[in-house]
Amino acid sequence: MAEITTKQTNLKKVSEKYNELIKQKSGKCSKILFLVSDGKLIEKIKSSININSYIEEPQILTYISFIMKELEKYWTLISKELKSVKGVPNNIPYSLPEYIITEMVENFRYKYGYFEDITGTSENISKSIYSNLRSAAYMNTDIYSTGEKIYYTKKNKDNLERFSYTQNDEIIKEYTDKLIEKSAIDLPMAIYLYTEKLLKKEEYQKSLSKRYDYLIIDSIEKTSNAELELVKVFEKMGKETFVYGNISGDITSIYNFDLDNIVEHYSKEDELASNKLENKNLANHQRYGAKYKDLIPFSNRIKECYQSQLYNEMIEDILYKSEEIAKDSKKIGKTAIIIPPGSGILLHRITDALQKRGIKYFSTITDYKISQYRYANLLIIIAALYAGNSEIEFSTEEYIQMISLILGINKIKANKIFRENETLLKSTILENSELDKIYAESREITFDNFLGNIENENSEIDIKDINNSVENVHNLDRIIEKIYIGRKKNLKRSEFMRRFYTEVLITLEDGIENIEICKKVITECEKLEEAAECGIIKDFEIDKILKAYSKDYIGFRELKNSEGNDKLMITTPFYYINSLSERGIQLWADCGNNMWNPKIAKEINNSIVLRKSYEEKQIFTDLDEEKLKKYYMNNLLYSLLDSAEEVYTFKSDYSLNGYLSESMMYTSIINLMDREEI
């Protein structure tokens, strides 16, 4: 049964169905597979269940969590076919795919002349290739022909070099072969292997049939084509499926989903006959989702449009409004500042100013690399020095900042200490035998006595005792000392980082406040160490990946702990919509920025044409681009306004870079306020 509404999905209704099925199964809730669109919903659903009504652990999972567990449990069913060398798959960290593919692009580009007519950097090409792979996996289309498909939809394909698109597919093949060889999986490979390999095995389908009697899906609009294949298997096995959803605001572009294909499957049921898809021409499709007329009832929720000439003036307007709201303690916890994606500078300026003005906030935005945080970068530098990694270079400024933090001194003094001790500090890249001598000489004691003290197996190494036994210990010896001792103990890089944090950084002025970001660096390092042990990367590459590719992320528990009724929320439109937030006061920042509604077709990337519902080799025209952008803008506005009580918009005539700032977003807002057709 599929229940598709044109209103917000009622979580209570879905939970009631779940409770009803639990009663039917006499509390055996493990027989019910409940797939939710977001992990944040799991706790809400569990809290709605009568704890006395079930006798087993509820199987409430996201689709990704479910397939990851299934792959780990049933890996042996597909490992022989894949010629995998290990019995259990290794999940690689999110930072690794971009690094591996960028390295491949660099190699193929300069060694074999690949991507000759592509103007982007190797890193940008890598992002496009990985985006194509991810989209194809979600769309359940051939992951090895994404470049070819995109090429044939280009309006100017006759003037393009086809090889640049087939080379996209070669890189994907090279990348996936490398992962499979090492029994490693990332997100798109997990989706692909589960859907194309494991789910098609008769033995696995029998296992599913034995374990589950029901399937519940809470959100059809956030269901991928790959997830639909699981639904089809349940239907084929004669199991009951219950699918709920809301197609009033089509935001599937955010999720790489294909609502056309999903609705077409369910439209075969009688109650959905009216949704039967007929016209597959993108330029004409407006079958569901919000129309402009659906926005009109919300127009009175936009209370004021602040327009300034300069970018800095716009920021001041945002801060002025934030201060005004913050005066009312009841309002601040109901307020969200929503900024377009990729606005790191705007985010930094707003958060910096809020902090100075004493306004509490929490941010869900993770545009920053981990290394952009001072304490995190300090740990990365220390880890590289500990590993003796000569393959990575840090700037003088980074060393000075590290010394300034550890010693609690200003940068002028830190610079002086660095200049005086640069050789000693950088000597950590030397072999242990050479470091032994430098370390001993710096304390004016004999090498033999010192080494004997360190290597005495019958006594526990006590850093304080060592410090007390040496005269004239230099401030920087604290760093060198821990590196030396860590090496003698043969500690892993991540374990050394953990000890350095707990023994040194946590004692510093802001040490405790930086626990979370330091934990993230250490956790990321542990995952990269596992990847190195599998042979996916070399050990010396760990430091480079940590510095250049590892991104900040916000865990659900961390976000929950940071939220509060006394804090402003700073977020992006897509995160806000997906978070089911109930903040009725919204401040839309930088509405002249086109990232509110970004370009769909890029040089070698276009997720739309990778959809199953997109006709093969159909040219993606400028008209398609404009109509879809307008379509998604209407749906974005609908989804934001639907949860709003008061909206304040902010725009500057000139962008951060000094260009005239105009966007479809702002035009839509003005027309909506004037109730004009757009």
Language model region names:
Residues 34-36, 60, 239-246, 649:
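Structural recognition of the conserved hydrophobic beta-strand(s) that form the central parallel beta-sheet
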Residues 570, 579-596:
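A short beta-strand element within the Helicase C-terminal
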Residues 29-137:
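Conserved P-loop NTPase-based nucleic-acid remodeling module centered on helicase motor cores
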Residues 329-481:
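ATPase/helicase motor core of nucleic-acid motors
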Residues 1-6, 103-216, 225, 305-310:
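Accessory N-terminal region flanking or inserted into the helicase ATPase core
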Residues 440-573, 580-582, 645:
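Accessory C-terminal helicase-associated subdomains
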Residues 1-46, 225, 229, 246-389:
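Conserved motor-region signature of P-loop NTPase helicases/translocases
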Residues 589-670:
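C-terminal accessory regions
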